[in-house]
């Protein structure tokens, strides 16, 4: 009892570890928590290099999503279109009802008359082709801005009130005369004729492009020119080159088109032609074969000849009347200038006369070069033999010779034109020319 505490216990009353018991574990800090959502790096090695990559159908899903979005857009557009149609349907029905009311007020049939004088916004004096003049009213739905003295109007069949305006439309024949597409021929396609090109530029092109030059020098530009010469010398070709080089409206008409069947239609067509040219100014009016209507006036024995003379008188009036032509230039062409009426050729109407002679040696050489530039010629071809010939060639004859020589080469299945082909072509063209033209016609 008197013994002290046992040596096996420590100060706190715990038993000291014996040598045979395990020692306590050392304190180790807890491992940090793994990061969520972070992709762990894969160990690189020989196994990773040999492993195939994982492929997911992400591209197909994106394409399908894009397709569905596009379909949705189309469906939304269709829905909006259907909604607009339903909303506009009552308005269309109302507009149709208003149109039917206007038709009932106009009545059928309607008379055609002329507006003589506009009294006020609601009343006017009108006349018909047969009968006296009337003081009538103007219905409220008529466009007052288009009413002007002299215009054609529609009148009620019974009360003769103004119910509409008859629009003055362009004659279909005149609309056909307008050259919509510029010709492909240019001044570079014309062999020679340098003096003629210079004259027509001064008389036709320069007044339209630079009118201030004529004002500064104090002269009036020419109103028109006439191109005359033997057939095939390049008159129509030069007119096409003018149409190609200028931006003005080009109206082309053949003289025979101005001769109409019924009385008064020819002068009316001439007036309509120049009215359209004035509306579309700056413009150029080209009348080919003017000798069809511009021949010398004699005592006419038939109604047809008198109608041709009336057409020519209207043409004279349009060329040099009280109304100034302004930016409208006239080009006439003929190969029989001696048969034209002197009144048509006097200065003031046609201020410049341009002659087209047969080509000389220099011009022939240039024309042959133009027409053979795209042809495949053999080495034995000598064009100087045809240039220096004494036969009278026109530009059209030279073109016909080149074309005929090419056809002869094609007939023999050859891709090159030889000198013999040109000789045969020349003989053929000259034979047809001498056979087809009456002797002494162009002397």
UniProtKB/Swiss-Prot annotation:
Keywords: ATP-binding, Cytoplasm, Isopeptide bond, Nucleotide-binding, Nucleus, Proteasome, Ubl conjugation. GO terms for biological process: female gamete generation; maintenance of root meristem identity; male gamete generation. Residues 12-28, 87-106 have a biased composition (Basic and acidic residues). It is found in: Cytoplasm; Nucleus. InterPro entries: 26S_Proteasome_ATPase (IPR050221), AAA+_ATPase (IPR003593), AAA_lid_3 (IPR041569), ATPase_AAA_core (IPR003959), ATPase_AAA_CS (IPR003960), NA-bd_OB-fold (IPR012340), P-loop_NTPase (IPR027417), Prot_ATP_ID_OB_2nd (IPR032501). There is a cross-link at residues 296, 433 (Glycyl lysine isopeptide (Lys-Gly) (interchain with G-Cter in ubiquitin)). ATP binds at residues 229-236. It holds the Pfam family Prot_ATP_ID_OB_C. Its main location: cytoplasm. Preferentially expressed in the root and shoot apical meristem. One of its GO terms (cellular component) is proteasome complex. GO terms for molecular function: ATP binding; ATP hydrolysis activity. Gene3D superfamilies: 1.10.8.60, Nucleic acid-binding proteins (2.40.50.140), P-loop containing nucleotide triphosphate hydrolases (3.40.50.300). Residues 1-55, 87-108 are annotated as: Disordered. Disruption phenotype: No visible phenotype under normal growth conditions. The double mutants rpt2a and rpt2b are blocked in both male and female gametogenesis. Component of the 19S regulatory particle (RP/PA700) base subcomplex of the 26S proteasome. The 26S proteasome is composed of a core protease (CP), known as the 20S proteasome, capped at one or both ends by the 19S regulatory particle (RP/PA700). The RP/PA700 complex is composed of at least 17 different subunits in two subcomplexes, the base and the lid, which form the portions proximal and distal to the 20S proteolytic core, respectively. The 26S protease is involved in the ATP-dependent degradation of ubiquitinated proteins. The regulatory (or ATPase) complex confers ATP dependency and substrate specificity to the 26S complex. Acts redundantly with RPT2A in the regulation of gametogenesis. With RPT2A plays a critical role in 26S proteasome assembly. Belongs to the AAA ATPase family. This is 26S proteasome regulatory subunit 4 homolog B. It comes from Arabidopsis thaliana (Mouse-ear cress). The gene is RPT2B.
């Amino acid at each position: 009892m008197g013994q002290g505490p046992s040596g096996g216990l420590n100060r706190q009353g715990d038993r000291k570890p014996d040598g045979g018991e395990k020692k306590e574990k050392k304190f180790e800090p807890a491992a940090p928590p793994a990061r969520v959502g972070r992709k762990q790096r894969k160990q690189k090695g020989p196994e990773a290099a040999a492993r195939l990559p994982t492929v997911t159908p992400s591209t197909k899903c994106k394409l399908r999503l894009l397709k569905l979005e596009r379909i949705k857009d189309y469906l939304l557009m269709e829905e909006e279109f259907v909604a607009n149609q339903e909303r506009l349907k009552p308005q269309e029905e109302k507009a149709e009802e208003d149109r039917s009311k206007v038709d009932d007020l106009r009545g059928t049939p309607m008379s055609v008359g002329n507006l003589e004088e506009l009294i006020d916004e609601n009343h006017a004096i009108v006349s018909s082709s047969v009968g006296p003049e009337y003081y009538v009213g103007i219905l409220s739905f008529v466009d007052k801005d288009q009413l002007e003295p002299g215009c054609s109007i529609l009148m009620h069949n019974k009360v003769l009130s103004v119910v509409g305006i008859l629009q003055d439309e362009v004659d279909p024949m005149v609309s056909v005369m307008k050259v919509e597409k510029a010709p492909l021929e240019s001044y570079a396609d014309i062999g020679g004729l340098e003096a003629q090109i210079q004259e027509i530029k001064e008389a036709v092109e320069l007044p339209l492009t630079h009118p201030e030059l004529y004002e500064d020098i104090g002269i009036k530009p020419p109103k028109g020119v006439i191109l005359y010469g033997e057939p095939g010398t390049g008159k129509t070709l030069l007119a096409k080159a003018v149409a190609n080089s200028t931006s003005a409206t080009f109206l082309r008409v053949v003289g025979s088109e101005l001769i109409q069947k019924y009385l008064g239609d020819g002068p009316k067509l001439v007036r309509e032609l120049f009215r359209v040219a004035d509306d579309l100014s700056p413009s150029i009016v080209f009348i080919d074969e003017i000798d069809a209507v511009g021949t010398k006036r004699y005592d006419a024995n038939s109604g047809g000849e008198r109608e041709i003379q009336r057409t020519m008188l209207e043409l004279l009036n349009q060329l040099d009347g009280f109304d100034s032509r302004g930016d409208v230039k006239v080009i006439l062409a003929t190969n029989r200038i001696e048969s034209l009426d002197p009144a048509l050729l006097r200065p003031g109407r046609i201020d410049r006369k341009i002659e087209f002679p047969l080509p000389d040696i220099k011009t022939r050489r240039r024309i042959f070069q133009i027409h053979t530039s795209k042809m495949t010629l053999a080495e034995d071809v000598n064009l100087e033999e045809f240039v220096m010939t004494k036969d009278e060639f026109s530009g059209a004859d030279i073109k016909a010779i080149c074309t005929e020589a090419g056809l002869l080469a094609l007939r023999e299945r050859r891709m090159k034109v030889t000198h013999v082909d040109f000789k045969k072509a020349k003989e053929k063209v000259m034979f047809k020319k001498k056979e087809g033209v009456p002797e002494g016609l162009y002397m």
